[in-house]
C-alpha cells in the first residue's frame, strides 16, 4: 500500500441533508465543479453509510466523536426516558433538540467521557456545530449568529442565507488565526424539507454549496496552505420525497388513549400510557407501559395484549414500513407486514464491534416469513464488515448492524417506527411545509458523500464513523480506542 499522506490542518464540512446519489450525479455532470475537480478527480469522492437514526444531531456525532449515536445514548432528535414508577409521569423525562439551547442540552445528555474533535485538534474552530464539548468560547464562530440567521432565513424563506453565514464564519475563523475549522452548512437539508430532496430549488442548494466550497478552497490556496490542509466534505443523512403526512399519535390513541407527543406535552404529562417522539419525521421512538404499568416492559408477542394490538394496527397502516423492538436482551426484531428479520447480538459486548477490527464478533441474522428488508439470502452469522459488504447495494444498507448499535442506547424506545417512503409521521406543528423526510433505514436516508482532497486507499465499505479517526490519523494524532469507526489511510 502507498505511504499514507499527512496534513497539518483540517477543514471538515458537514453539508446537512446532502444525499450521496445527488452529489455523485451533480459532480459527475459538472454541476458541482469544485467537488469534481478537487475530490472526484483524485479518487477522493466516495459513498459512506450514515447511522440510524439518520437525523441531524445524533447523526453529527460520528464525525465529531467517532461514535454511533447509540453509544452516546442519543436515540433521536426527540426522545424520552421511561417513567420509573407505575404512573406515566414524564415530567423532565423528555427531550427535543428542535429547540433553543441545543449545545447545552447535548452537553448534559451525552455521556461525560465522550470526547470530540475539539479535544484532539489544537486550534480547531466551530461553525454551527450542535455538539461543541471541548470547544473554547473564543473558537465558537457562530455562537450568536446561528440562531439569528435561522430566524431570518425562516421569515424570508431564504435558506441559502444559512450557507452564506457558514461560509463567512469559516473565513472569519481563519482571519482570527484558527488553522482548522469544523463547519455545518444547513441549507440543503432545509431546502429538501421545504421543496423536496430532488426539487430544482434543492439542487440549486447543492450548486451554491459547491460554489461556497470553491471560494473556501481558493482562500486556502491564496494563503498558501491548501496542500497542507485536509478538506473533508460529508453529510449526516439524505432525504426521501414526502407526499403524505400521518400523525403517529393519532394511530396510537385507539390502543393507548393517553399518548404523550411533542409539542403538546401538557396533555397526559403525569398520566401517560404511551409517548411518541418523532425524529426527522420518518422515524419515531415509542415508549409504552406494560400490561401491569410502567415498571414493566411491553411484550409485543403476547397474544391479546395492547402492545401486540398496536403492533398489528401499525403494520396494517400504509404509512408504516417497519417496526423494531427488543424480543429479549440482545435480540432485536424488525417487523414488516409479511415477515420479520431477527438480529441476535448477544455475543456483542459493550466495546465489541469497534471499527478498528480488533473485535471481529459475529451477529446472528434469521428471517421469519418474508424478509422485510428485501435482502437476498444472507449468512446466519456475519461480522460487522460482512453485514456492510453484503447489504451495501440494497434498499437498506447496513440495516442489521445499525440495530445493534442503536439499541446500545438505554433511551431507545420500546417500539421504533419507520415510515414508508413517501410518508412521514408528523402532520402538525412544523415551522415550514415538509416535502422531504429522513430518519429511517432507507437507502436515500442512509447513504451520504465522504469526500477528501486526497485518495482513499481502502476500498472496504465506508461509514461516517470512520471519518473521525481518519482525520486524526491524517493529522498525525493518536486515535483513541473504543470508537465505532476505523481510520482509513489517505494517499496523494
Which residues are covered by each model-predicted region?
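Beta-strand elements within well-structured catalytic alpha/beta cores of enzymes
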Residues: 7-23, 38, 63, 121, ...
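Secreted, luminal/periplasmic, and some membrane-associated catalytic domains
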Residues: 49, 54-55, 77-105, 222-230, ...
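Polar, surface-exposed loop/tail segments
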Residues: 321-335, 477-492
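Low-complexity, glycine/alanine/valine/leucine- and proline-rich hydrophobic stretches
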Residues: 408-466
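A short beta-strand-to-alpha-helix junction
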Residues: 204, 266-282, 293-307, 445, ...
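Short, structured active-site-proximal loop/turn typified by the sulfatase FGly-forming signature C/S-X-P-X-R
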Residues: 24-73
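Active-site-proximal N-terminal segment of extracellular/periplasmic enzymes that hydrolyze or transfer
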Residues: 1-44, 483
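His/Asp/Glu-rich, glycine-adjacent segments
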Residues: 60-200, 205-208, 333, 339-393, ...
Amino acid at each position: 500500500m502507498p505511504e499514507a499522506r499527512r496534513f497539518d490542518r483540517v477543514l471538515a464540512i458537514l453539508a446537512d441533508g446532502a444525499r450521496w446519489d445527488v452529489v455523485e450525479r451533480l459532480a459527475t455532470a459538472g454541476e458541482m465543479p469544485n467537488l469534481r475537480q478537487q475530490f472526484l478527480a483524485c479518487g477522493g469522492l466516495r459513498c459512506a453509510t450514515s447511522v440510524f437514526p439518520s437525523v441531524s444531531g445524533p447523526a453529527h456525532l460520528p464525525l465529531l466523536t467517532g461514535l454511533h449515536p447509540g453509544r452516546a445514548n442519543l436515540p433521536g432528535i426527540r426522545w424520552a426516558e421511561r417513567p420509573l414508577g407505575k404512573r406515566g409521569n414524564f415530567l423532565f423525562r423528555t427531550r427535543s433538540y428542535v429547540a433553543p439551547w441545543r449545545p447545552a442540552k447535548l452537553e448534559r445528555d451525552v455521556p461525560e467521557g465522550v470526547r470530540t474533535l475539539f479535544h484532539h485538534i489544537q486550534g480547531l474552530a466551530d461553525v454551527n456545530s450542535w455538539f461543541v464539548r471541548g470547544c473554547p468560547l473564543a473558537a465558537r464562530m457562530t455562537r450568536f449568529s446561528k440562531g439569528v440567521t435561522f430566524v431570518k432565513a425562516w421569515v424570508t424563506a431564504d435558506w441559502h442565507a444559512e450557507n452564506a453565514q457558514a461560509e463567512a464564519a469559516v473565513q472569519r475563523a481563519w482571519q482570527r488565526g484558527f488553522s482548522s475549522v469544523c463547519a455545518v452548512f444547513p441549507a440543503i437539508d432545509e431546502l429538501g424539507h421545504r421543496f423536496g430532496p430532488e426539487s430544482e430549488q434543492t439542487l440549486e442548494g447543492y450548486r451554491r454549496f459547491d460554489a461556497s466550497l470553491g471560494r473556501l478552497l481558493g482562500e486556502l490556496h491564496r494563503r498558501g496552505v491548501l496542500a497542507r490542509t485536509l478538506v473533508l466534505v460529508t453529510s449526516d443523512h439524505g432525504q426521501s420525497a414526502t407526499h403524505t403526512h400521518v400523525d403517529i399519535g393519532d394511530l396510537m390513541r385507539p390502543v393507548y388513549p393517553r399518548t404523550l407527543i411533542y409539542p403538546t406535552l401538557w396533555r397526559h404529562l403525569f398520566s401517560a400510557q404511551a409517548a411518541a417522539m418523532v425524529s426527522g419525521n420518518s422515524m419515531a421512538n415509542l415508549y409504552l407501559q406494560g400490561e401491569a404499568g410502567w415498571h414493566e416492559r411491553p411484550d409485543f408477542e403476547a397474544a391479546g395484549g395492547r402492545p401486540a394490538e398496536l403492533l398489528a394496527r401499525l403494520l396494517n397502516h400504509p404509512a408504516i414500513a417497519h417496526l423494531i423492538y427488543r424480543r429479549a436482551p440482545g435480540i432485536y426484531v424488525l417487523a414488516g407486514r409479511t415477515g420479520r428479520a431477527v438480529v441476535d447480538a448477544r455475543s456483542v459486548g459493550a466495546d465489541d464491534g469497534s471499527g478498528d477490527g480488533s473485535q471481529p464478533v459475529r451477529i446472528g441474522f434469521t428471517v421469519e416469513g418474508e424478509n422485510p428488508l428485501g435482502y437476498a439470502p444472507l449468512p446466519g452469522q456475519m461480522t460487522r464488515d460482512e453485514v456492510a459488504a453484503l447489504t451495501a447495494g440494497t434498499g437498506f444498507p447496513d440495516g442489521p448492524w445499525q440495530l445493534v448499535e442503536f439499541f446500545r442506547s438505554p433511551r431507545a424506545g420500546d417500539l421504533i417506527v419507520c415510515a414508508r417512503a413517501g410518508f412521514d409521521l408528523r402532520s402538525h406543528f412544523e415551522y415550514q411545509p415538509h416535502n422531504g423526510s429522513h430518519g429511517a433505514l432507507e437507502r436515500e436516508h442512509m447513504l451520504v458523500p465522504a469526500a477528501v482532497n486526497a485518495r482513499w486507499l481502502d476500498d472496504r465499505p465506508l461509514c461516517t464513523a470512520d471519518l473521525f479517526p481518519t482525520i486524526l490519523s491524517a493529522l498525525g494524532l493518536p486515535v483513541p480506542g473504543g470508537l465505532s469507526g476505523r481510520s482509513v489511510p489517505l494517499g496523494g
